């Protein structure tokens, strides 16, 4: 299973070294962590990438794809695991609003570019200490790369202009139905969109 990190007990169970240092998921999923706790920050994401790679899209993805295929439809997801695209949903019909762990960008934002990186393993991971080493490198400046994910307290995420443009074009049309699946008040991005559509 792919953990949500909203259940603190489950999070601590997966990452005992982080419990010892009182590092919560929100601490590690931040630009601050990549500058101050780099071995732990990259360990957190490397573990998540390996976990996501081991998991396959469940039947719900196939059902959704078959249902949406004949419709003029779009998926707006806060998930960063890439499972919608892996399940066969067309790229031009998905908006990964919080980014994807399968893309990287420069930690120092030397350029407003991101690149796909599907390699697993991406860096060395010591699961006993939950420290990573041999980090991925920015293709441009050769500095450290980071996940192309909108993190907590993140003003440096560069977004995905193509996905954003596709979604803008879609929402300009009349929309008859919006379905929220697995939405949480803790991450209300999709809730806001649904409410906005409801008020049209």
Model feature map: region roles:
Residues 1-200:
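Conserved catalytic core of sirtuin-type NAD+-dependent deacylases
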């Amino acid at each position: 299973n792919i953990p949500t990190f909203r259940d603190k007990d489950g999070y601590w169970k997966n990452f005992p070294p982080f419990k010892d240092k009182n590092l919560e998921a929100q601490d590690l999923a931040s630009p601050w962590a990549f500058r101050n706790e780099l071995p732990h920050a990259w360990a957190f994401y490397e573990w998540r990438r390996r976990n996501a790679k081991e998991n396959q899209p469940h039947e719900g993805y196939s059902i959704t794809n078959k249902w949406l295929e004949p419709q003029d439809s779009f998926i707006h997801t806060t998930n960063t695991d890439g499972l919608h695209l892996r399940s066969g949903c067309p790229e031009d019909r998905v908006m990964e609003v919080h980014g994807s762990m399968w893309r990287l960008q420069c930690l120092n934002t030397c350029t407003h570019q991101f690149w796909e990186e599907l390699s697993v393993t991406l860096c060395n991971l010591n699961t006993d200490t939950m420290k990573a080493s041999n980090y991925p490198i920015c293709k441009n400046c050769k500095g450290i790369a980071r996940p192309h994910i909108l993190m907590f307290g993140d003003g440096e995420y560069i977004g995905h202009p193509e996905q954003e443009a596709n979604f803008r074009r879609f929402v300009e049309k009349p929309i008859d139905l919006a379905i929220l699946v697995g939405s949480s008040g803790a991450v209300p991005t999709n809730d806001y969109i649904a409410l906005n559509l409801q008020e049209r």
